[in-house]
């Protein structure tokens, strides 16, 4: 049975949509995702949360099944806290990304259906990493994942500069997210922003 036949027989066995992005800017890291949660063609929630705090200096933005995102983030958060208790220092962004990679690869036969951008601030400065469902870890300066990613990453590609300040990064993130949402029926209903800087973490929701 091919995928088309499967989807005809099980019309709701479909990948959920999302538009999610992350970027490094001069003062820190910006993560963003929209709020719509879909089940097939039905919008199950207009207030889904797809950006997550892992520690005070690391967070993640995800696209995929919300339940799988939540399980993955809880496990990475637990390992990060255990690391800090064990060695009396905070886990680095790179190490947290590797922990997430190992968890995803360990589930490769029954994968967690989520693409993830993990990022934050540590002693090496701001950084982000992109992970697929099998745990591949790709460092980058900016990235977008999800069904609206092709449109969003085009806006980032055209306008991104690493020396952007916080306001410029926020404006670009919102612009890229709105562009992705405008062409993706499975994304929408506002944007959640998560920012990590030396001064700490901040969250913001943008309605439109």
Question: Residue spans of the language-model regions?
Answer:
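Long, low-complexity N-terminal extensions
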Residues: 1-208
């Amino acid at each position: 049975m091919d995928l088309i036949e499967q989807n005809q027989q099980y019309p709701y066995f479909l990948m959920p949509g999302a538009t999610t992005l992350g970027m490094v800017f001069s003062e820190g890291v910006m993560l963003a995702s929209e709020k719509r949660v879909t089940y097939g063609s039905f919008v199950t929630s207009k207030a889904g949360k797809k950006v997550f705090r892992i520690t005070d200096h690391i967070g993640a933005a995800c696209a995929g099944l919300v339940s799988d995102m939540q399980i993955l983030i809880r496990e990475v958060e637990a390992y990060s806290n255990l690391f800090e208790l064990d060695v009396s220092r905070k886990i680095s962004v790179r190490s947290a990304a590797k922990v997430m990679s190992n968890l995803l690869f360990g589930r490769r036969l029954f994968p967690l259906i989520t693409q993830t951008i993990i990022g934050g601030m540590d002693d090496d400065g701001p950084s982000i990493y992109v992970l697929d469902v099998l745990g591949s870890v790709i460092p980058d300066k900016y990235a977008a994942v999800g069904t609206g990613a092709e449109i969003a990453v085009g806006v980032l590609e055209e306008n991104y500069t690493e020396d952007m300040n916080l306001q410029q990064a926020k404006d670009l993130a919102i612009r890229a997210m709105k562009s992705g949402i405008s062409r993706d029926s499975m994304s929408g209903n506002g944007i959640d922003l998560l920012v990590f800087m030396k001064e700490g973490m901040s969250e913001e929701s943008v309605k439109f």
